[in-house]
A protein has these predicted regions:
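Short amphipathic beta-strand starts and helix->beta connectors
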Residues: 45-50, 220-222, 258-261
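Detector for small/aliphatic-rich hydrophobic stretches
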Residues: 1-136
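Mature, solvent-exposed C-terminal subdomains and processed small-chain segments of exported/organellar
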Residues: 183, 242-262
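Non-catalytic, conformational "gating/processing" segments within enzyme and secreted inhibitor domains
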Residues: 50, 89-244
Length: 262
């Protein structure tokens, strides 16, 4: 199971935004891949080299899109640049009897801040967002936001905010939940303890094993494999750097263009 959440806080907004044309779908997909990779690269730069990074570019893009809906002028242009001209409104993520994919959006507004009704209506209509006005000085509001996040990630993420600042006027959140079986399942009995070569040290960890045919590629010395989930719509792409190299050394070579080529 995979859960993710992203929150954005806003000091002011103006709800005037024109959605870009959706005719160039291929370019749109390429831009989305580029955004995801750049988002990961920027985030990775903020942590220590021996720390793990787990994030959801989709959640970040949805939260930023909700902000972009209320932007204009130079701010709108900056959102366009970051998101590649794409807006991530509510969409069918393909849940069925086999897999579960849920995305939920919410907008929390300070009772000291007024917001245009048409901006709220747009988020409710296009993003299926839950919208509420709250007292940001009340600690119960933080608890309510965390409870909402927990509810929409099946309890996997129960805490997203510690506190709210008196200067905060809005909180926008996207919560994402994913649970699906592998198309080619791993045999639990085949799991064995093996050595994982980390950046700091080698460590013995349980490793799954599966012998089957998968999509495979090599690029800049890295090995890539795609592990599809049942149904074929979603997959996990695993990148193994050359021996002795860490993620920081290979990230410059992982681009949207390189990803499409593979």
């Amino acid at each position: 199971m995979i859960s993710a959440a992203a929150a954005a806080m806003l000091l002011s907004c103006s709800p005037k935004y024109v959605k870009p044309s959706s005719t160039a779908s291929a370019q749109s997909d390429s831009d989305k891949i580029e955004f995801a990779l750049e988002f990961f690269k920027k985030t990775n730069q903020t942590v220590d080299y021996d720390e793990n990074v787990v994030l959801s570019p989709y959640s970040a893009a949805v939260a930023l899109s909700m902000l972009a809906e209320g932007a204009e002028g130079e701010t709108k242009a900056e959102f366009d640049d970051v998101l590649g001209g794409n807006l991530y409104a509510a969409e069918d993520l393909g849940s069925n009897d086999v897999l579960t994919v849920k995305s939920a959006n919410s907008l929390w507004i300070s009772d000291n801040f007024s917001i245009r009704n048409r901006y709220v209506s747009l988020l409710e209509k296009d993003y299926d967002a839950f919208v509420t006005v709250q007292n940001f000085a009340d600690p119960a509001t933080v608890k309510e936001i965390n409870n909402w996040c927990s509810e929409h990630t099946a309890g996997k993420i129960g805490h997203i905010l510690d506190e709210l600042s008196p200067n905060d006027v809005m909180v926008l959140i996207n919560a994402l939940y994913f649970n699906a079986p592998w198309e080619k399942a791993f045999d639990e009995n085949a799991t064995e303890d093996m050595v994982f070569h980390g950046v700091v040290e080698d460590k013995e960890v349980p490793m799954m094993y599966r012998k089957a045919t998968f999509d495979y590629a090599e690029y800049q010395g890295c090995q890539l494999i795609r592990l599809p989930y049942e149904g074929g719509r979603y997959s996990m792409v695993v990148v193994l750097p050359p021996y002795g190299m860490g993620i920081d050394q290979i990230l410059p070579y992982i681009t949207g263009t390189a990803y499409k080529v593979q």
